[in-house]
Amino acid sequence: INAVTQDLYLSDKSDQRLIVFDEAWQFLGESSTLKEVIEEGYRRARKYHGSFTIITQSVLDMKLFGGVGDVIRNNSAFKFYLESSDFEKALDEKLMDYDEFTMRILKSTKSNKPKYSEIFMDTPFGVGVGRLAVDPFSYYVFTSDASEITEIEAMVDGGVSYEDAIREMVKKYRS
């Protein structure tokens, strides 16, 4: 983490930097040092032509962040949400602050894999829902579905290249 933050704070400020913490909850367990790094990053990154991003499975994970969660929410100009059943609870727990109309839009967000995933976007320019649709090959390259990954890995273990395994998945499941 030192190398990452050093790169942000000491590098040429004309170069943009994006620091992403995927499954962010795991970084915030008992390590108060890492909490401080993330909190400082969310407060200062803009000054260095950088930004911090966290990815979690649920908006409710923000509770695990403690006070850092407030800093993250208050310093995040852009928020993106995929389909979830946690939105009402997050609203009740003050992890979100949307009016009834916006909540209806947020809760309407759906995923229809492998065809598309809808994404609710809360930006300085407004809120709304967009669709991410990818071609079938790209879908299987980036899938996080355990059964699909298992099927691809089984083909690879059987001597098929990843590319051919993915092409086979596309043929098998094309609808």
Show the residue positions of the predicted features.
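Conserved P-loop NTPase motor cores
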Residues: 1-104
